[in-house]
Each structure stands twice: as C-alpha cells, then as structure tokens.
From Swiss-Prot:
Protein name as it appears in the record: Large ribosomal subunit protein bL17
Basic residues: compositionally biased ranges: 129-138
Subunit field text: Part of the 50S ribosomal subunit. Contacts protein L32.
CC per GO annotation: cytosolic large ribosomal subunit
Annotated spans, Disordered: 127-163
Keywords: Ribonucleoprotein, Ribosomal protein
C-alpha cells in the first residue's frame, strides 16, 4: 500500500535531497533552463513553484523564507528582482517540463525544466503558427466558397432531367 508516501525520495537521504533540490533551484533561477532526469524535475517543480509564488511579494520575511531554502544570495536577488516582475500576473505554473528522450549511459528518461516566461523561442513559434493557420484557413475558405456555389448549379439541371 502507498500510505504516507507523499514525495519521491530519489534514493537519497533527507539532507542530500534538500541540498540537491536547493542547488537545482538556484541553477534554474540563474540559467532559466536546466537538463535533468524526469523524477528530479518533478521534485524540483514541487520545490521551486512555492518559492516563486513567495517572491511575488517583496517583503523582508518572504526574502528570509526563500533564502532559507535556496542559500544563495545571487539567486534570491535575481528571483525577487527579475523573475517576480516577469511572472507577476501569472497565477501559477511557472515551470515547464519538456521530455527529451533517454540518456545513453543508463537509459534514464531525461528532460528540460524551464521557466515558462523566459522561453522566447516557444512564444515566437506559437505566434508564427497562428499566423500560418489563419492564412491557410482564409485560402481554404475562399476556395471552398466558389466550389460551393458551383456545386448547387450543376445539381439543379440533373434534378430537372431526372424528373
């Protein structure tokens, strides 16, 4: 049975796990995207999202709470100065996990974990796809309209000749 197993231990002691998650969170905040295994990324997502939410209000207490988890002044400063401003209107879901396949050495499932608002490449692709879709739909709609007009005209004489 699965009672009282709320999080993945990742095969580590509690101190090792907390240190690893703290270091990974600092790397994510500094670099905006890191490559890791899927299990670690899911654990990191649970660890870092409440910290990002806490950074939305820039008070002394919230800075102390975040620093107690991260232990890195540069990461805390960047989180409160840059990231919290950029994600101010987002209600949650600050990170995204993108699976990249399996690692060659041990066949572990790998992925990127990144901050959602910092991936300009995906935002540009989405805009370009929308523009392409609207162009195609206009052309297909224009092509379908004349075909629809011609089709009833050809059907009417057939209906008259059949009667």
């Amino acid at each position: 049975m699965r009672h009282n197993k709320k999080f993945n231990h990742l095969g580590r002691t509690a101190s090792h796990r907390s240190a690893m998650l703290s270091n990974m969170a600092c790397s994510l905040i500094k670099h905006k995207r890191i490559t890791t295994t899927v299990a670690k990324a899911k654990a990191l997502k649970k660890f870092v999202e409440p910290l990002i939410t806490k950074s939305k209000e820039d008070t002394t207490n919230s800075r102390r709470v975040v620093f107690s988890n991260l232990q890195d002044k540069i990461a805390v400063t960047e989180l409160f100065k840059e990231i919290s401003v950029k994600i101010a209107d987002r209600p949650g879901g600050y990170t995204r996990i993108i699976k990249t396949g399996n690692r060659l050495g041990d066949n572990a499932e790998m992925c990127f974990i990144e901050l959602v608002d910092y991936n300009e490449n995906m935002a540009k692709e989405k805009v370009a796809k929308k523009a392409t879709r609207t162009r195609r739909s206009k052309k297909s709609a224009e092509a379908a309209a004349p075909a629809a007009v011609e089709a009833p005209a050809t059907e009417e004489p057939k209906a008259e000749s059949a009667e």
